[in-house]
């Protein structure tokens, strides 16, 4: 039962210089009394791709199903996975404007991972003093290779 799963809190962020351009992503995972950070980069990407990658890489670290509280400052990620994705599936992965969904391969991977875990999604305002959001932001920006 998914209610009996172990719990993890995750904060993610992505950053990009140029958009498109070099980018970085990061996640802070909080397990009970333990904290783990992960981060990475891409030489030619977009901010949205980095935001998605941060969430995907964090969820991929979890080898068994977890109850996940996931905090992102990306409306694109939160609304995409909680609202838009259902409509995209019904519309053959087309947007409301009948255009192909951007970053489709990332959305497909995120959808699969999110369905494996029990994820509760939260949007957090960026740059207002949330400790772990700031940590993820700092790590993501540190990964940008100019």
Swiss-Prot record:
It comes from the Bacteria. Pfam families: RNase_H. Belongs to the RNase H family. GO terms for molecular function: magnesium ion binding; nucleic acid binding; RNA-DNA hybrid ribonuclease activity. GO terms for cellular component: cytoplasm. Coiled coil: none annotated. Endonuclease that specifically degrades the RNA of RNA-DNA hybrids. Its cofactor is Mg(2+). Residues 4-145 form the RNase H type-1 domain. Keywords: Cytoplasm, Endonuclease, Hydrolase, Magnesium, Metal-binding, Nuclease. Its EC number is 3.1.26.4. It catalyses: Endonucleolytic cleavage to 5'-phosphomonoester. Mg(2+) 2 binds at residues 13, 137. CDD domains: RNase_HI_prokaryote_like. NCBIfam families: PRK00203.1. This is Ribonuclease H. PANTHER family: RIBONUCLEASE H1 (PTHR10642:SF26). The keyword Membrane does not apply. Mg(2+) 1 binds at residues 13, 51, 73. Binds 1 Mg(2+) ion per subunit. May bind a second metal ion at a regulatory site, or after substrate binding. The keyword Metal-binding applies. Gene3D superfamilies: Ribonuclease H-like superfamily/Ribonuclease H (3.30.420.10). Its main location: cytoplasm.
């Amino acid at each position: 039962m998914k209610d009996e799963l172990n719990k993890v809190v995750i904060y993610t962020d992505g950053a990009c210089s140029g958009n498109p351009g070099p980018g970085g992503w990061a996640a802070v995972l909080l397990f009970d009394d333990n904290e783990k950070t992960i981060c990475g980069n891409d030489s030619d990407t977009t901010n949205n791709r980095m935001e998605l990658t941060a969430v995907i890489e964090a969820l991929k670290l979890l080898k068994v199903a977890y109850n996940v509280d996931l905090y992102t400052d990306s409306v694109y990620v939160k609304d995409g996975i909680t609202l838009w994705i259902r409509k995209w599936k019904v519309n053959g992965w087309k947007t409301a404007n009948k255009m192909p969904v951007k970053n489709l391969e990332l959305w497909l991977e995120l959808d699969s991972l999110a369905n494996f875990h029990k994820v509760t999604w939260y949007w957090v305002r960026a740059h207002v003093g949330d400790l772990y959001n700031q940590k993820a932001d700092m790590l993501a920006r540190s990964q940008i290779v100019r």
